[in-house]
From Swiss-Prot:
Gene (UniProt): groEL
Cross-referenced PANTHER family: 60 KDA HEAT SHOCK PROTEIN, MITOCHONDRIAL (PTHR45633)
Subcellular location: Cytoplasm
SUBUNIT field: Forms a cylinder of 14 subunits composed of two heptameric rings stacked back-to-back. Interacts with the co-chaperonin GroES.
Listed SUPFAM superfamilies: GroEL apical domain-like (SSF52029), GroEL equatorial domain-like (SSF48592), GroEL-intermediate domain like (SSF54849)
Binding annotation for ATP: 30-33, 51, 87-91, 415, 495
Protein name, entry field: Chaperonin GroEL
Gene3D superfamilies the record matches: GroEL (3.50.7.10), GroEL-like equatorial domain (1.10.560.10), TCP-1-like chaperonin intermediate domain (3.30.260.10)
Keyword Isomerase appears in the UniProt entry: yes
Gene Ontology molecular function, alphabetical: ATP binding; ATP-dependent protein folding chaperone; isomerase activity; unfolded protein binding
Keywords: ATP-binding, Chaperone, Cytoplasm, Isomerase, Nucleotide-binding
Disulfide bonds: none
The keyword Nucleotide-binding is assigned to this record: yes
A single GO cellular-component term on record: cytoplasm
Amino acid sequence: MAAKEVRFGDDARSKMLKGVNTLANAVKVTLGPKGRNVVLDKSFGAPTITKDGVSVAKEIELEDKFENMGAQMVKEVASKANDEAGDGTTTATVLAQAIVTEGLKSVAAGMNPMDLKRGIDKAVIAAVEELKALSTDCADSKSIAQVGTISANSDAEVGDIIAQAMEKVGKEGVITVEEGQALQNELDVVEGMQFDRGYLSPYFINNQENGTVELDNPFILLVDKKISNIRELLPTLEGVAKAGKPLMIIAEDVEGEALATLVVNNMRGIVKVAAVKAPGFGDRRKAMLQDIAILTGGTVISEEIGLELEKVQLEDLGTAKRVVINKDNTTVVDGNGDQEAIEGRCAQIKGQIEESSSDYDKEKLQERLAKLSGGVAVIKVGAATEVEMKEKKDRVEDALHATRAAVEEGVVPGGGVALVRAAAKLSELTGDNEDQTVGVKLALRAMEAPLRQISINSGAEASVVVNEVKNGDGNYGYNAGNDTYGDMLEMGILDPTKVTRSALQFASSIASLMITTEAMVAELPKDEAAPAMPDMGGMGGMGGMM
């Protein structure tokens, strides 16, 4: 085991604080509408330019191991805030730095670190309740666009496109962000349920111009097995032909004789038919077939529940207004399923999302939920260069997370005002003893830090701005974008409650642990031994010399 270096007390804490400040100072320049960019060097390719706090934090590793420990703990604050709410990483970092700095001053002055921690915790719990009381619902497109705009660093175009996407696919819908080909941002919306399986044979195509299969008001047969014997399908084909409607088959696979017969029937015009493979694999395939069944009002034909393909009746088939199939995707528009059954299935999937511990499973469940409840929107980010594209895509993703958080828990006045108002309401709060009260007060003082930093980044005098905002009440605050004061909600400067709340909780959690640190242990740096000099052989022709 390698030898370790141990540092104690103020020596340890001062090293840790230096690391905290190095990381936080690099991150906090990005805060607010007039925040600056940070350029990150990459080992290959062009450098990345970003205003995303967590992206900056993740790049920072310090040479001194004790300083690095402080930096890594603040990095954890930014990462946690990003995981929880998808935004607010810079705010969380600024809060953590403020609490640690104030806290370590109090420890140096002889306060008990554990009592300080209890005081900080008490203040934060009370402040979170105040934030919830300040919160208002974020339901209409205008406020969603405003939240997106603020989170994308005052880019109104991004806010508007996210609001449009949410309007099209609903609050639960899946919205994905991709790199586009154009210079402008574009929004693509897929109505209905789409899954990534195309037609099994190009002979099913009936729209030659687009290379797609288009079926109007089709019956939909859902089968949880491979179909290779046409005899099993004959009763269904006859029933559908009599009804004079097209048929779409979704099965594990359709092959051999069965597929050939379907193609021949289709080409002769006896029955308009198309077949696709069921989406997903294993248990997920069964679940997705069941989703399609509920959406279209059909039944999954599965031998597991005693249903045989030969005995299928027309009432077992699902129906939809329209189905469009290309070589890669199938889209079912306006399934005729029972609305109550669809809502019940959505509620069931939401329950599974909450219980799931796997990010991958959560993502897949979220996709299924979106497909059932509205559709999928794709925001294609446009930019002139690859460097700009990366920076813009980061901002759009941040804004998307922020708007989801806003819809979930509501919004509070932005620009650091909510934290100042919450702190003002708690000015009478005290701890169980003097040291705890100091902890309470330092946490409330630290809650002014985001507003101070926004002011500094916009070139204003921080103390003047903070006093002006404190003298006001309600939503009155400072708009750093145009250097004016007024009602933050009316000016459209909103922050999601969830983002502000989680930034404060994670910052105080890690910062109060750092305040209570008394010793730090790190490996001693290894001395790199200089390589031995190579043996110098005798010079040629010197053999006879004595």
